[in-house]
Amino acid sequence: MNGAESLIKTLVDSGVEVCFTNPGTSEMHFVAALDEVAGMRCVLGLFEGVVSGAADGYARMAGKPAATLLHLGPGLGNALANIHNARKGHVPIINIVGDHATYHLEYDAPLTSDIEGIAAPVSHWVHTATDPEDIAAAAATAVHEAGSNRVSTLVLPADVSWGENPRGPSAPTQPRELPLVDPVRLEEAVRALDAGPRAMILMGGGVVTAEMGDLAGRIAASTGARLCLETFPTRVARGAGRAVMERLPYLAEQAIEFLADVDQLILVGAATPVSFFAYPGVPSVLSADQCNVLTLATADENRASALKDLLLLLGDKTANARVYEQTEIPLPSGELNAMSLSQGLAGLLPAQAVVVDEGATTALPTFPLTAQAAPHDWLALTGGSIGFGLPCAVGAAIAAPERKVVCLEGDGLSLIHISEPTRLNSTSRMPSSA
Protein backbone atom coordinates (compact mmCIF):
# COMPACT_ATOMS: atom_id res chain seq x y z
CA MET A 1 0.00 0.00 0.00
CA ASN A 2 1.05 3.60 -0.46
CA GLY A 3 1.71 6.14 2.26
CA ALA A 4 -1.81 7.60 2.21
CA GLU A 5 -3.42 4.17 2.51
CA SER A 6 -1.21 3.19 5.43
CA LEU A 7 -1.97 6.53 7.11
CA ILE A 8 -5.74 6.11 6.81
CA LYS A 9 -5.61 2.47 7.92
CA THR A 10 -3.64 3.50 11.02
CA LEU A 11 -6.15 6.24 11.83
CA VAL A 12 -9.13 3.89 11.43
CA ASP A 13 -7.53 1.13 13.49
CA SER A 14 -6.87 3.73 16.22
CA GLY A 15 -10.53 4.76 16.36
CA VAL A 16 -10.55 7.81 14.05
CA GLU A 17 -13.58 7.21 11.85
CA VAL A 18 -14.51 10.59 10.31
CA CYS A 19 -12.48 12.95 8.13
CA PHE A 20 -13.78 16.45 7.40
CA THR A 21 -12.06 17.71 4.29
CA ASN A 22 -11.53 20.42 1.70
CA PRO A 23 -8.76 18.85 -0.39
CA GLY A 24 -6.69 20.11 -3.30
CA THR A 25 -4.21 18.68 -5.78
CA SER A 26 -1.61 17.72 -3.18
CA GLU A 27 -4.18 15.62 -1.28
CA MET A 28 -5.58 13.63 -4.23
CA HIS A 29 -3.76 10.43 -3.29
CA PHE A 30 -5.26 10.66 0.21
CA VAL A 31 -8.71 11.14 -1.35
CA ALA A 32 -8.16 8.14 -3.63
CA ALA A 33 -7.03 6.08 -0.65
CA LEU A 34 -10.40 6.68 1.02
CA ASP A 35 -11.90 4.37 -1.62
CA GLU A 36 -9.32 1.68 -0.89
CA VAL A 37 -9.41 1.64 2.92
CA ALA A 38 -12.68 0.80 4.67
CA GLY A 39 -13.88 2.48 7.83
CA MET A 40 -13.29 6.20 7.24
CA ARG A 41 -16.29 8.45 6.59
CA CYS A 42 -15.35 11.46 4.48
CA VAL A 43 -17.38 14.68 4.82
CA LEU A 44 -16.67 17.49 2.34
CA GLY A 45 -16.80 21.11 3.49
CA LEU A 46 -17.02 24.03 1.08
CA PHE A 47 -14.59 26.09 3.17
CA GLU A 48 -11.81 25.10 5.53
CA GLY A 49 -13.33 26.97 8.47
CA VAL A 50 -16.37 24.74 8.10
CA VAL A 51 -14.12 21.68 8.11
CA SER A 52 -12.33 22.62 11.33
CA GLY A 53 -15.51 23.77 13.08
CA ALA A 54 -17.26 20.51 12.22
CA ALA A 55 -14.31 18.51 13.53
CA ASP A 56 -14.58 20.50 16.77
CA GLY A 57 -18.30 19.77 17.17
CA TYR A 58 -17.83 16.11 16.31
CA ALA A 59 -15.12 15.61 18.93
CA ARG A 60 -17.12 17.40 21.64
CA MET A 61 -19.95 14.90 21.18
CA ALA A 62 -18.03 11.76 20.19
CA GLY A 63 -15.42 12.06 22.92
CA LYS A 64 -12.66 11.33 20.43
CA PRO A 65 -10.99 13.20 17.58
CA ALA A 66 -11.96 13.45 13.95
CA ALA A 67 -9.40 14.15 11.25
CA THR A 68 -9.33 17.16 8.97
CA LEU A 69 -7.72 17.12 5.52
CA LEU A 70 -6.54 20.57 4.43
CA HIS A 71 -4.78 21.94 1.35
CA LEU A 72 -1.31 23.29 2.10
CA GLY A 73 -0.58 26.33 4.26
CA PRO A 74 -3.34 28.61 2.92
CA GLY A 75 -5.95 25.90 3.50
CA LEU A 76 -4.71 25.43 7.04
CA GLY A 77 -4.75 29.20 7.47
CA ASN A 78 -8.40 29.34 6.42
CA ALA A 79 -9.18 26.76 9.13
CA LEU A 80 -7.27 28.45 11.96
CA ALA A 81 -10.15 30.33 13.60
CA ASN A 82 -12.06 27.20 14.53
CA ILE A 83 -8.91 25.22 15.30
CA HIS A 84 -8.16 28.02 17.76
CA ASN A 85 -11.61 27.54 19.32
CA ALA A 86 -11.00 23.80 19.63
CA ARG A 87 -7.63 24.33 21.28
CA LYS A 88 -9.08 26.80 23.78
CA GLY A 89 -11.90 24.34 24.50
CA HIS A 90 -9.50 21.41 25.03
CA VAL A 91 -11.06 19.53 22.10
CA PRO A 92 -9.04 16.85 20.24
CA ILE A 93 -8.48 17.25 16.50
CA ILE A 94 -6.02 15.60 14.11
CA ASN A 95 -5.17 17.90 11.20
CA ILE A 96 -3.69 16.29 8.08
CA VAL A 97 -2.24 19.08 5.94
CA GLY A 98 -1.08 18.29 2.43
CA ASP A 99 2.11 19.84 1.11
CA HIS A 100 4.10 19.91 -2.10
CA ALA A 101 6.32 16.93 -2.80
CA THR A 102 9.52 17.19 -0.78
CA TYR A 103 11.67 17.66 -3.88
CA HIS A 104 9.39 20.45 -5.18
CA LEU A 105 9.66 22.71 -2.13
CA GLU A 106 12.98 24.24 -3.21
CA TYR A 107 11.30 25.86 -6.22
CA ASP A 108 9.02 28.04 -4.04
CA ALA A 109 5.85 27.44 -6.08
CA PRO A 110 2.96 29.87 -5.42
CA LEU A 111 1.35 27.78 -2.68
CA THR A 112 4.59 27.00 -0.85
CA SER A 113 4.53 28.20 2.77
CA ASP A 114 5.82 27.48 6.26
CA ILE A 115 3.10 25.02 7.27
CA GLU A 116 4.67 24.13 10.60
CA GLY A 117 4.92 27.83 11.43
CA ILE A 118 1.24 28.35 10.61
CA ALA A 119 0.21 25.30 12.64
CA ALA A 120 2.30 25.91 15.75
CA PRO A 121 0.14 28.55 17.54
CA VAL A 122 -2.96 26.34 17.43
CA SER A 123 -1.37 22.90 17.83
CA HIS A 124 0.11 20.95 20.72
CA TRP A 125 2.05 18.64 18.39
CA VAL A 126 3.29 19.34 14.84
CA HIS A 127 5.25 16.97 12.62
CA THR A 128 6.20 16.80 8.93
CA ALA A 129 6.56 13.35 7.43
CA THR A 130 9.46 12.93 5.00
CA ASP A 131 9.32 9.23 4.06
CA PRO A 132 6.38 6.99 3.05
CA GLU A 133 7.70 4.27 5.35
CA ASP A 134 7.36 6.56 8.38
CA ILE A 135 3.95 8.12 7.75
CA ALA A 136 1.92 5.41 9.50
CA ALA A 137 4.01 5.67 12.66
CA ALA A 138 3.59 9.45 12.54
CA ALA A 139 -0.19 9.00 12.25
CA ALA A 140 -0.19 6.77 15.32
CA THR A 141 1.76 9.40 17.23
CA ALA A 142 -0.71 12.08 16.10
CA VAL A 143 -3.62 10.07 17.55
CA HIS A 144 -1.75 9.46 20.79
CA GLU A 145 -0.81 13.12 21.19
CA ALA A 146 -4.34 14.36 20.42
CA GLY A 147 -5.71 12.10 23.13
CA SER A 148 -8.95 13.51 24.50
CA ASN A 149 -8.09 17.19 24.61
CA ARG A 150 -5.29 18.28 22.25
CA VAL A 151 -4.67 19.33 18.65
CA SER A 152 -2.22 17.36 16.50
CA THR A 153 -1.08 18.54 13.07
CA LEU A 154 0.61 16.16 10.64
CA VAL A 155 2.04 17.58 7.41
CA LEU A 156 1.76 15.14 4.49
CA PRO A 157 3.95 15.92 1.44
CA ALA A 158 2.51 14.64 -1.83
CA ASP A 159 5.36 12.21 -2.54
CA VAL A 160 5.06 10.74 0.96
CA SER A 161 1.37 10.21 0.22
CA TRP A 162 1.82 8.49 -3.15
CA GLY A 163 5.05 6.64 -2.31
CA GLU A 164 4.97 2.95 -1.44
CA ASN A 165 5.08 1.95 2.22
CA PRO A 166 6.21 -1.67 2.52
CA ARG A 167 5.81 -1.49 6.30
CA GLY A 168 2.06 -0.95 6.00
CA PRO A 169 -0.04 0.54 8.80
CA SER A 170 1.20 0.93 12.33
CA ALA A 171 -0.35 -0.96 15.22
CA PRO A 172 -3.39 0.73 16.79
CA THR A 173 -2.43 3.31 19.36
CA GLN A 174 -4.14 4.41 22.53
CA PRO A 175 -4.87 8.09 23.21
CA ARG A 176 -2.64 9.83 25.71
CA GLU A 177 -4.04 9.27 29.21
CA LEU A 178 -4.67 12.21 31.48
CA PRO A 179 -2.54 12.07 34.64
CA LEU A 180 -4.00 11.98 38.14
CA VAL A 181 -3.70 15.05 40.33
CA ASP A 182 -1.13 15.42 43.09
CA PRO A 183 -2.62 14.21 46.43
CA VAL A 184 -1.26 17.38 48.04
CA ARG A 185 -3.73 19.42 46.01
CA LEU A 186 -6.60 17.23 47.19
CA GLU A 187 -5.66 17.95 50.80
CA GLU A 188 -5.37 21.67 50.04
CA ALA A 189 -8.86 21.60 48.51
CA VAL A 190 -10.29 19.96 51.64
CA ARG A 191 -8.74 22.68 53.80
CA ALA A 192 -10.07 25.40 51.49
CA LEU A 193 -13.59 23.95 51.64
CA ASP A 194 -13.36 23.68 55.44
CA ALA A 195 -12.25 27.31 55.74
CA GLY A 196 -15.80 28.64 55.61
CA PRO A 197 -18.87 29.10 53.46
CA ARG A 198 -17.31 31.65 51.10
CA ALA A 199 -15.87 29.01 48.76
CA MET A 200 -16.63 28.39 45.10
CA ILE A 201 -15.91 25.41 42.84
CA LEU A 202 -15.37 26.59 39.25
CA MET A 203 -15.84 23.88 36.61
CA GLY A 204 -14.44 23.89 33.07
CA GLY A 205 -11.45 22.85 31.04
CA GLY A 206 -13.31 20.60 28.61
CA VAL A 207 -16.45 18.49 28.68
CA VAL A 208 -18.35 18.64 31.98
CA THR A 209 -20.34 15.41 32.03
CA ALA A 210 -23.46 14.70 34.07
CA GLU A 211 -21.33 12.49 36.33
CA MET A 212 -18.82 15.27 36.93
CA GLY A 213 -21.63 17.70 37.65
CA ASP A 214 -23.10 15.29 40.18
CA LEU A 215 -19.74 14.76 41.90
CA ALA A 216 -19.09 18.50 42.11
CA GLY A 217 -22.67 19.09 43.22
CA ARG A 218 -22.29 16.60 46.06
CA ILE A 219 -19.08 18.30 47.17
CA ALA A 220 -20.79 21.70 47.07
CA ALA A 221 -23.84 20.45 48.99
CA SER A 222 -21.62 18.84 51.61
CA THR A 223 -19.49 21.91 52.26
CA GLY A 224 -21.75 24.87 51.51
CA ALA A 225 -19.60 25.94 48.58
CA ARG A 226 -21.06 27.56 45.49
CA LEU A 227 -20.84 25.54 42.27
CA CYS A 228 -20.13 27.51 39.13
CA LEU A 229 -19.43 26.88 35.45
CA GLU A 230 -16.95 28.80 33.30
CA THR A 231 -18.49 31.41 31.01
CA PHE A 232 -18.12 29.49 27.75
CA PRO A 233 -18.25 25.73 28.42
CA THR A 234 -16.94 23.26 25.85
CA ARG A 235 -19.87 20.99 26.59
CA VAL A 236 -21.92 20.74 29.75
CA ALA A 237 -24.71 18.33 30.70
CA ARG A 238 -27.58 20.37 32.09
CA GLY A 239 -31.36 20.52 32.42
CA ALA A 240 -33.71 18.43 34.55
CA GLY A 241 -31.95 15.99 36.86
CA ARG A 242 -28.53 17.62 36.38
CA ALA A 243 -26.59 19.49 39.04
CA VAL A 244 -27.43 23.13 39.69
CA MET A 245 -24.54 25.35 38.54
CA GLU A 246 -24.19 29.07 38.35
CA ARG A 247 -22.46 30.53 35.30
CA LEU A 248 -19.63 33.04 35.49
CA PRO A 249 -20.85 36.27 33.83
CA TYR A 250 -19.20 37.44 30.62
CA LEU A 251 -18.95 41.17 31.35
CA ALA A 252 -15.97 42.02 33.56
CA GLU A 253 -17.86 44.33 35.92
CA GLN A 254 -20.57 41.71 36.49
CA ALA A 255 -18.00 38.95 37.01
CA ILE A 256 -16.11 41.03 39.58
CA GLU A 257 -19.32 41.56 41.54
CA PHE A 258 -20.21 37.87 41.15
CA LEU A 259 -16.88 36.82 42.70
CA ALA A 260 -16.57 39.64 45.24
CA ASP A 261 -17.37 37.58 48.35
CA VAL A 262 -15.47 34.43 47.32
CA ASP A 263 -12.51 33.76 49.61
CA GLN A 264 -11.60 30.29 48.31
CA LEU A 265 -11.82 29.62 44.55
CA ILE A 266 -11.20 25.98 43.63
CA LEU A 267 -10.52 25.43 39.93
CA VAL A 268 -11.54 22.11 38.36
CA GLY A 269 -10.21 22.32 34.82
CA ALA A 270 -11.12 25.99 34.56
CA ALA A 271 -8.51 28.72 34.30
CA THR A 272 -8.24 31.65 36.69
CA PRO A 273 -11.10 33.98 35.70
CA VAL A 274 -9.84 36.94 33.67
CA SER A 275 -11.52 39.68 31.68
CA PHE A 276 -12.27 38.82 28.04
CA PHE A 277 -10.65 42.14 27.04
CA ALA A 278 -8.75 44.85 28.91
CA TYR A 279 -10.69 47.96 29.89
CA PRO A 280 -9.43 51.21 31.48
CA GLY A 281 -9.62 51.01 35.24
CA VAL A 282 -10.85 47.39 35.25
CA PRO A 283 -8.54 44.66 36.64
CA SER A 284 -7.60 41.78 34.36
CA VAL A 285 -8.02 39.17 37.11
CA LEU A 286 -11.66 39.04 38.18
CA SER A 287 -11.40 37.38 41.60
CA ALA A 288 -11.10 39.59 44.68
CA ASP A 289 -7.72 40.48 46.16
CA GLN A 290 -8.41 38.44 49.30
CA CYS A 291 -9.37 35.34 47.30
CA ASN A 292 -7.15 32.27 47.49
CA VAL A 293 -7.19 30.62 44.06
CA LEU A 294 -6.44 26.90 44.20
CA THR A 295 -6.13 24.54 41.24
CA LEU A 296 -7.53 21.11 42.09
CA ALA A 297 -7.08 19.81 38.54
CA THR A 298 -5.89 21.45 35.34
CA ALA A 299 -7.55 20.86 32.00
CA ASP A 300 -4.71 18.47 31.20
CA GLU A 301 -5.37 16.27 34.25
CA ASN A 302 -8.08 13.78 35.14
CA ARG A 303 -10.80 16.06 36.51
CA ALA A 304 -13.39 13.33 37.13
CA SER A 305 -10.94 11.26 39.15
CA ALA A 306 -9.95 14.34 41.17
CA LEU A 307 -13.59 15.01 42.08
CA LYS A 308 -14.11 11.38 43.12
CA ASP A 309 -10.99 11.44 45.30
CA LEU A 310 -12.01 14.75 46.87
CA LEU A 311 -15.44 13.35 47.68
CA LEU A 312 -13.83 10.36 49.39
CA LEU A 313 -11.67 12.65 51.52
CA LEU A 314 -14.78 14.49 52.70
CA GLY A 315 -16.02 11.18 54.12
CA ASP A 316 -19.26 11.17 56.09
CA LYS A 317 -20.04 14.79 55.29
CA THR A 318 -21.23 14.00 51.76
CA ALA A 319 -24.74 15.02 50.71
CA ASN A 320 -26.78 14.71 47.55
CA ALA A 321 -26.28 17.30 44.85
CA ARG A 322 -28.90 19.95 44.23
CA VAL A 323 -30.42 19.21 40.83
CA TYR A 324 -32.79 21.03 38.52
CA GLU A 325 -36.38 19.86 38.63
CA GLN A 326 -38.08 19.66 35.26
CA THR A 327 -40.94 22.11 35.06
CA GLU A 328 -43.54 22.66 32.39
CA ILE A 329 -42.46 25.88 30.73
CA PRO A 330 -45.43 27.76 29.23
CA LEU A 331 -45.11 28.69 25.58
CA PRO A 332 -44.92 32.42 24.95
CA SER A 333 -47.50 34.62 23.29
CA GLY A 334 -47.41 38.14 21.95
CA GLU A 335 -44.32 39.88 20.62
CA LEU A 336 -41.40 37.89 19.23
CA ASN A 337 -38.25 39.01 21.03
CA ALA A 338 -35.20 37.53 22.75
CA MET A 339 -37.15 36.56 25.85
CA SER A 340 -40.11 34.95 24.07
CA LEU A 341 -37.79 33.13 21.67
CA SER A 342 -35.79 31.73 24.59
CA GLN A 343 -38.94 30.75 26.45
CA GLY A 344 -40.25 28.92 23.40
CA LEU A 345 -37.00 27.00 23.02
CA ALA A 346 -37.02 26.06 26.71
CA GLY A 347 -40.57 24.76 26.45
CA LEU A 348 -40.06 22.76 23.27
CA LEU A 349 -36.48 21.50 23.67
CA PRO A 350 -36.48 17.71 23.14
CA ALA A 351 -34.90 15.40 25.68
CA GLN A 352 -31.20 14.75 25.02
CA ALA A 353 -30.99 17.63 22.55
CA VAL A 354 -27.65 19.26 21.77
CA VAL A 355 -27.66 23.07 21.85
CA VAL A 356 -24.86 24.87 20.01
CA ASP A 357 -24.78 28.47 21.21
CA GLU A 358 -23.47 31.25 18.98
CA GLY A 359 -26.58 33.35 19.34
CA ALA A 360 -24.75 36.41 20.69
CA THR A 361 -26.89 38.98 22.51
CA THR A 362 -30.26 37.66 21.33
CA ALA A 363 -29.58 34.30 22.95
CA LEU A 364 -28.55 35.69 26.35
CA PRO A 365 -31.83 34.73 28.11
CA THR A 366 -31.74 31.21 26.68
CA PHE A 367 -29.16 29.69 29.02
CA PRO A 368 -30.95 30.49 32.31
CA LEU A 369 -34.40 29.75 30.88
CA THR A 370 -33.38 26.27 29.71
CA ALA A 371 -31.93 25.24 33.09
CA GLN A 372 -35.14 23.36 33.97
CA ALA A 373 -35.84 22.13 30.45
CA ALA A 374 -35.45 18.50 29.42
CA PRO A 375 -31.92 17.08 29.87
CA HIS A 376 -29.58 18.34 27.16
CA ASP A 377 -25.97 19.24 26.36
CA TRP A 378 -24.84 22.83 25.81
CA LEU A 379 -21.87 23.69 23.56
CA ALA A 380 -20.46 27.23 23.62
CA LEU A 381 -17.91 29.31 21.72
CA THR A 382 -14.76 28.54 23.70
CA GLY A 383 -12.13 30.62 21.92
CA GLY A 384 -14.06 33.76 21.01
CA SER A 385 -13.40 33.35 17.27
CA ILE A 386 -16.78 33.80 15.62
CA GLY A 387 -18.19 31.61 12.87
CA PHE A 388 -18.22 28.46 14.99
CA GLY A 389 -21.93 27.73 15.41
CA LEU A 390 -23.18 26.20 12.17
CA PRO A 391 -20.03 24.12 11.50
CA CYS A 392 -19.99 22.88 15.10
CA ALA A 393 -23.64 21.87 14.81
CA VAL A 394 -22.89 19.81 11.71
CA GLY A 395 -20.08 17.96 13.46
CA ALA A 396 -22.22 17.37 16.55
CA ALA A 397 -25.03 15.95 14.42
CA ILE A 398 -22.67 13.56 12.65
CA ALA A 399 -21.30 12.37 16.00
CA ALA A 400 -24.77 11.95 17.55
CA PRO A 401 -27.26 11.27 14.72
CA GLU A 402 -29.88 10.01 17.17
CA ARG A 403 -30.07 13.39 18.94
CA LYS A 404 -31.71 16.64 17.88
CA VAL A 405 -29.18 19.43 17.37
CA VAL A 406 -30.35 23.02 17.82
CA CYS A 407 -28.02 25.80 16.72
CA LEU A 408 -28.54 29.29 18.12
CA GLU A 409 -26.84 31.44 15.50
CA GLY A 410 -26.60 35.23 15.30
CA ASP A 411 -27.58 36.52 11.89
CA GLY A 412 -24.30 38.31 11.29
CA LEU A 413 -22.23 35.43 12.64
CA SER A 414 -23.94 33.01 10.26
CA LEU A 415 -22.55 34.91 7.26
CA ILE A 416 -19.00 33.86 8.13
CA HIS A 417 -19.66 30.25 7.13
CA ILE A 418 -22.83 30.70 5.11
CA SER A 419 -22.04 27.61 3.01
CA GLU A 420 -22.91 25.40 5.95
CA PRO A 421 -26.70 25.17 5.33
CA THR A 422 -25.73 23.31 2.16
CA ARG A 423 -23.99 20.73 4.31
CA LEU A 424 -26.99 20.59 6.65
CA ASN A 425 -29.21 19.68 3.71
CA SER A 426 -26.85 17.32 1.91
CA THR A 427 -25.45 15.19 4.71
CA SER A 428 -27.63 12.28 5.75
CA ARG A 429 -28.69 11.35 9.28
CA MET A 430 -28.41 14.91 10.60
CA PRO A 431 -31.48 16.00 12.62
CA SER A 432 -30.37 19.63 12.95
CA SER A 433 -32.11 22.98 13.05
CA ALA A 434 -30.80 26.52 13.23
Regions found by a protein language model. Name each.
Residues 2-84, 88:
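N-terminal cofactor/phosphate-binding cores enriched in small/glycine residues
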Residues 4-8, 12-17, 22-25, 30-37, ...:
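Active-site diphosphate/adenylate-binding microenvironment
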Residues 2, 133, 153-156, 167-169, ...:
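Phosphate/pyrophosphate-binding active-site segments
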Residues 33-34, 57, 101-121, 239-243:
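Active-site-proximal loop->helix
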Residues 15-18, 60-97, 120-170, 189-199, ...:
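Structural signature of the thiamine diphosphate
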Residues 60, 205-296, 373-403, 419:
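Glycine-rich, anion-gripping cofactor-binding loops and their flanking helix/strand elements
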Residues 416-434:
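Single conserved hydrophobic/aromatic residue that forms the stacking wall/gate
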Residues 25-27, 48-50, 71-76, 97-103, ...:
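Acidic, glycine-rich active-site loops and adjacent beta-strand->loop/helix elements
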